[in-house]
Amino acid sequence: GSEMCIRDSVPLVCFTGQVPLPLIGNDAFQEVDIVGITRNITKYSVTVRDRKDLGKIIKMAFHIARTGKPGPVLIDLPKDIQTASGPAEYPDKVEIRGYRVNDTVHVGQLKRAYKMLKSAKKPLILAGGGINVARANENLRRFVEAENVPVVTTIMGKGAIPTTHPLYVGNCGMHGKYAANKAVSECDLLFSIGTRFNDRITGDLNEFAPKAKIVHIDVDTASISRNVVVDVPIVADANVALDKLNEWAEPKKTAEWQKQIKAWDEENPLGMRRDKGMTPQMIMEHINKNYKDAIYVTDVGQHQMWATQYLELDSNSQLLTSGGLGTMGFGLPAAIGAKIANPDKDVVLSLIHISEP
């Protein structure tokens, strides 16, 4: 769960039990160095060693989990800390040494990226899950419409812009649309926001976007040029960057480029056979017609790919899925959580088969 959350930028605070403080380090019965084990799959992990620090640590944990690139935090509670009594102190705010949330953008780098966008003949915006995490969807839509630039998404980025929007091409990558992948291959500028460029999107790195200059905007410094070496790296929250870009935005002439992308889509569209009885694609079509404004949740498997290919999303709907790790078993608990958090919304869950519940 923790590894999935760190890949998909899901805020999570885990509380684990530990042997009493005096026994730590003695190989006591059921002692596990859970902090050490999870250090590489959490943003922060800590053992509470003084009950008086508990409130401060919990405050820190939720702040770290939610800010920057969201992710998991682990708090390890020794048994004697759990059973200790005394007044609880929960501070209004905490200062965390060495932890800084970047709420700015390097305007010079952003201007450089924008100039490249203006001069490009075949520009393409690649929107990743970072758009949905930052809730920058409206900002992205405004920028896309102002610039008149086509958009492709990753699986985790689906819904970053309404799927029925005329400038939306589709998902790219291993399970993406032909037109979206062709556009990535032929574009001369790939303007990427909130994506890690993982292998399911890029395939062979030597063949990925071979004709394009690449701009990469991401809140996580470690993601920049990790998989794909980019021409203009920009460390910034998606909303912060898009706010500034929207101040500069003005329409581009991309009619011929859009016409070419449409031709590719007509050449190899997503199919839907209707001569063999009920198909999974027809089920997705039925969901689109009857469950608008819903939260769609999938488990992991081929049914997940059908959902990412055929579900229609707009500003009032959402897709929850395990993209970075492909965690089977994710669907049911995620759907339960989605319903608890949104009791007035329909939640549609797609499972591998009906035996999971």
Q: What annotation goes with each model-predicted range?
A:
Residues I354-P357:
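A short, hydrophobic C-terminal helix/tail in secreted or cell-surface proteins
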Residues T38, L245, W257-W264, A307:
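Generic structural signal of hydrophobic/aromatic residues within well-ordered alpha-helices
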Residues L74-D76, G128, E256-Q260, D299-V300:
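Short coil/turn segments at secondary-structure boundaries
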Residues G1-A249, H286, I295, D346:
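N-terminal alpha/beta PP-like core and its mobile active-site loop of ThDP/TPP-dependent enzymes
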Residues Y90-V107, T254-G277:
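Long, charged amphipathic helices and adjacent flexible linkers at domain junctions
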Residues K262-D344:
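Active-site diphosphate/adenylate-binding microenvironment
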Residues L349:
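Short beta-strand-to-loop acidic/aromatic patch adjacent to the donor-nucleotide binding site
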